[in-house]
Every structure is written in C-alpha cells, then in structure tokens.
C-alpha cells in the first residue's frame, strides 16, 4: 500500500512518520449517496487514534452524517479524495501533532473533562483547543485502554495445567520407550573391563571438550558480535543525508570537496537542491554554540552553499530545522539571520519569502518576528527614498 508523510507539508522523503494514502469510494445514488473511506482503520492505526474520532471529525467538518457499520466508515455525500485528505490534514494538525515539536507521537490524557496532549518525542504535556466540537465526543468516548492484566492472569492460571500435561506426556513417552526395549548386561570379566575403559575415556573427552568450549567460544562470539555492531553502526551512519555529510566532515575536507560531496549526496538520496543545502547546514551545525560560531566564522563556505541551486532557501530551512530540534537556538535565530543578511549571504527577498511562504514552524516564525518587522520597515524606507529621488530628478 502506498504511503505518504503524516505531515504532508514535509517534503523530505526520509521523514520517519508515514501513513497510508487515503482511499475514498463513492457508493449509492441520489439522496443515498455516500463516500466510504476504504482504509480508515489502517490510517487510524498509523496515527494512533480511534477511527471513530476521524469519522466524527469529518462529520463536523462537512456538516454531514457519518456512518459506521462493520468497520466500514462513510460520510453522507460525495467528496473527492483531495477534499477528504485536506480534512484529514486538519484533524492531524489539531488532534495528532504535538504543538511544541510538531511530531505525531502524542497520546490523549483526559482529566476532569479536559483533554491534554502527552508527547513521547519531546516529553511535553499541553492542552488542546477544547472549543472544537470533537473534544466533547472524545471526552464521552475516551481512547480504549489496552489492559494486559486479564490475559496475564489467564496465562498464570493455565501454567499449572500445562506443566501437569507436559509431565504426564513425558512419563507416557518414557514408559512407551521402555516397553519397546529389552535390557540386559554382560557380566563377564572381559565385558566389565571394557566398560571401565570406555567410561574413563568418555569422562576425559568430556572434560577436554568443556575446557575448549570455555576458552574458545566466548572469545569468538564476542569478536563476531563486535564485527556485527561495527557493520550496523556503519550502516546507520550512512542511512540519511545528514549522517552521510557528517561522516564526510570528519575527514576535514576543503570547501570545494564538500561542494562535490553535496552533489553526490543529492544524487545518491534523490534530494531536491534545497533539501541538500538544508542537510549540509544541519550536519555543519551540531549544537547551539557551534551554530553561532559557524555563522560568524564560515562566511565563505556559507556563500558557496548559497550559490547552489535553491541554496539560500536550503540555508534558511536548515536553520529553521535546527531551531525546532534545539530550542536554545530560538533566542539566537534573529542574530543568525542578521549575520547572514549583513554578510550578503541572504537578501531581504530571500528571508521574507521564506518567512511568509516556506517557514513551517510557528515557534521559529514567532521567534524572528522582530527582525522581520525591522527588515520590512527598512525595505519600505528604501522604497520611499527611491521614490523621492525619482521625484527630485
């Protein structure tokens, strides 16, 4: 089944959170026409939400009655797949994504009629908008808790009976085997001597075998495990563009070598040009201290990255992603943008277009609003000056 990013606004093909592509099917005629969401149970599983919540959200969104019958979910009326997908995006935004980190790893916690998000990705707990009509339905129909206590108790209760049956079966098998064999012992002096020699030989062999097992096997097993770990570690390092670039940076390459590496990474992972530059920024800036230092000292390298196709957009998206992952950088985002602007790496047009059209993180947008206001004011003043000069001439 084809899959799509849970956040459809994220174009990164390596985005880890996926769900099935929504499938709709129109049934009936006239007043009885309805649209069936064929794979809603699978989508609900991918989102870790009750399918009834999604159906109810569609009912509210389209102002149409929903129907649930034998795990078949439908909405009265005829709707295109794109319209259903857009409504699903709204549901995901309001009732799945964490309001802090924007990852879909949340669960509902209902306390005294108030629903809160608990995010497994960032650990934050926060309330959701209780004004939406769906919240009252969720409170009345809370998520089903999966309890393992009953199944555990049943298993414990069955253990004595299972053990008893095993013992009974083993005893029966032993009795059957004994019935089929006739045992006798040669009591002659020669036979007794041979049995004695064989017993001594078997004991010696067993001791030697045990010593060999103790001294050799753990060492070879350990070496084998170490080799496996090294192979797995190497595979993980190259599993995504950022890791691939980070590994290459450990060789201290020249700027031109890094540019060539970015070209090969783009081809290897099938990235857009802006996504490649974004990955480069993420790899080059590993923490808040390095990020600020990097912006101030690596102007030449940043200019080279900016000259790549869509490189300026990639730089902005990269710093946005860094701020989303590390909130300590949020207080420095305006200074970072100012340095990039003053150094001629980014222009007013680049920054304003990113801010108004491409930026996705509300936290980052809010954090740099003062700088954007200053930039827009400066742009207006510059336009006024140009108009005055034209009037004078």
Curated annotation (Swiss-Prot):
Q: Coiled coil: which residue ranges?
A: none
Instruction: Enumerate the spans annotated as W2 domain.
Output: 223-385
GO BP terms: namely: formation of cytoplasmic translation initiation complex
Instruction: Name the segments for region: Disordered.
Output: 144-179, 217-247
Q: Does the keyword Nucleotide-binding apply?
A: yes
Q: Which SUPFAM superfamilies match?
A: ARM repeat, Translation initiation factor 2 beta, aIF2beta, N-terminal domain, Zinc-binding domain of translation initiation factor 2 beta
Q: What does this protein do?
A: Catalyzes the hydrolysis of GTP bound to the 40S ribosomal initiation complex (40S.mRNA.Met-tRNA[F].eIF-2.GTP) with the subsequent joining of a 60S ribosomal subunit resulting in the release of eIF-2 and the guanine nucleotide. The subsequent joining of a 60S ribosomal subunit results in the formation of a functional 80S initiation complex (80S.mRNA.Met-tRNA[F]).
Q: What family does the entry list?
A: Belongs to the eIF-2-beta/eIF-5 family.
Where along the chain is composition biased (Acidic residues)? 224-233
Q: What is this protein called?
A: Eukaryotic translation initiation factor 5
Which controlled-vocabulary keywords does the entry list? GTP-binding, Initiation factor, Nucleotide-binding, Protein biosynthesis
User: What are the record's GO terms for cellular component?
Assistant: cytosol
**Originating organism:** Dictyostelium discoideum (Social amoeba)
Q: Which InterPro entries match?
A: ARM-type_fold, IF2/IF5, Transl_init_fac_IF2/IF5_dom, Transl_init_fac_IF2/IF5_N, Transl_init_fac_IF2/IF5_Zn-bd, W2_domain
So where does GTP get bound?
Answer: 28-35
Q: Which GO terms describe its molecular function?
A: eukaryotic initiation factor eIF2 binding; GDP-dissociation inhibitor activity; GTP binding; translation initiation factor activity
Disulfide linkage: none
Keyword GTP-binding attached = yes
């Amino acid at each position: 089944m084809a899959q799509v990013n849970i956040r459809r606004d994220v174009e990164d093909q390596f985005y880890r959170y996926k769900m099935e592509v929504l499938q709709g099917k129109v049934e009936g005629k006239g007043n009885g026409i309805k649209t069936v969401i064929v794979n809603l149970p699978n989508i609900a599983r991918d989102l870790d939400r009750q399918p009834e919540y999604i159906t109810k959200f569609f009912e509210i969104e389209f102002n149409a009655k929903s129907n649930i019958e034998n795990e078949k979910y439908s909405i009265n009326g005829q709707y295109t797949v794109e319209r259903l997908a857009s409504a699903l995006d709204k549901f995901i935004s309001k009732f799945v994504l964490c309001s802090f980190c924007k990852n879909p790893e949340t669960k509902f916690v209902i306390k005294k009629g108030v629903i809160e998000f608990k995010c497994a990705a960032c650990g934050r707990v926060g309330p959701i908008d209780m004004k939406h009509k769906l919240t009252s339905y969720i409170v009345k129909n809370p998520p089903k808790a999966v309890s393992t206590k009953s199944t555990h108790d049943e298993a414990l209760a069955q253990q004595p009976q299972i053990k008893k049956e095993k013992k009974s079966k083993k005893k029966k098998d032993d009795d059957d085997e004994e019935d089929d064999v006739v045992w006798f012992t040669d009591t002659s002096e020669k036979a007794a001597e041979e049995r004695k020699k064989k017993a001594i030989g078997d004991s010696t062999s067993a001791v030697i075998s045990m010593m060999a097992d103790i001294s050799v096997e753990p060492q070879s097993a350990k070496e084998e495990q170490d080799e496996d770990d090294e192979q797995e570690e190497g595979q993980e390092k190259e599993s995504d563009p950022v890791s691939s670039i980070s590994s290459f940076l450990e060789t201290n390459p020249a700027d031109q070598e890094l540019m060539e590496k970015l070209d090969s990474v783009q081809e290897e992972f099938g990235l857009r040009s802006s996504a490649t530059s974004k990955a480069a920024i993420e790899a080059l800036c590993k923490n808040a201290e390095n990020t600020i230092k990097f912006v101030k000292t690596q102007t030449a390298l940043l200019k080279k990255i900016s000259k790549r196709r869509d490189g300026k957009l990639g730089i902005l998206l990269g710093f946005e992603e860094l701020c989303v992952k590390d909130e300590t950088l949020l207080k420095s985002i305006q200074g970072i943008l100012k340095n990039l602007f003053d150094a001629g790496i980014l222009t007013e047009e680049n920054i304003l277009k990113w801010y108004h059209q491409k930026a996705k993180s509300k936290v980052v947008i809010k954090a740099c609003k003062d700088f954007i206001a200053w930039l827009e004011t400066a742009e207006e003043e510059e336009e006024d000056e140009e108009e005055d000069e034209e009037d004078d001439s």
